[in-house]
Amino acid sequence: MSTVEERVKKIVCEQLGVKEGDVQLTSKFVEDLGADSLDTVELVMALEEEFETEIPDEEAEKITTVQDAIDYILANQ
């Protein structure tokens, strides 16, 4: 089983069409990885599906980096 970090990075790569080497823990989805608002919504939906959790909109707005996503998943598993 992959770690949460590996799974989050894989989803980010798939959703945003970026190379794994370009995805750092500090990478911001919009500024660093070129995501737009639709991309971020789809990214949150993919994370919800992968980790079988629900991320409320007010929490989703706070998830702006790869590390934010990992931290949220770990805190809410």
From Swiss-Prot:
For whether the record's keyword set contains Transport, the answer is no
Post-translational modification as stated in the protein's UniProt record: 4'-phosphopantetheine is transferred from CoA to a specific serine of apo-ACP by AcpS. This modification is essential for activity because fatty acids are bound in thioester linkage to the sulfhydryl of the prosthetic group.
This protein's record includes keyword Cytoplasm: yes
Outline the extent of the Carrier domain: 2-77
Q: Which GO terms describe its molecular function?
A: acyl binding; acyl carrier activity
GO CC terms in record: cytosol; membrane
What compartments host this protein? Cytoplasm
An example Gene Ontology biological process: lipid A biosynthetic process
Coiled-coil positions:
none
Principal location listed in the UniProt entry: cytoplasm
Q: In which pathway does it act?
A: Lipid metabolism; fatty acid biosynthesis
- Check the record and name the Pfam families matching this protein: PP-binding (PF00550)
Question: At which residues is O-(pantetheine 4'-phosphoryl)serine found?
Answer: S37
- Keyword terms of this UniProt record: Cytoplasm, Fatty acid biosynthesis, Fatty acid metabolism, Lipid biosynthesis, Lipid metabolism, Phosphopantetheine, Phosphoprotein
- Protein role: Carrier of the growing fatty acid chain in fatty acid biosynthesis.
HAMAP family this protein is in?
Acyl_carrier
Family assignment from sequence similarity: Belongs to the acyl carrier protein (ACP) family.
Q: What is the name attached to this protein's record?
A: Acyl carrier protein
Q: Which organism encodes this protein?
A: Hahella chejuensis (strain KCTC 2396)
Task: Give the classification, highest ranks.
Answer: Bacteria, Pseudomonadati, Pseudomonadota, Gammaproteobacteria, Oceanospirillales
Protein's gene: acpP
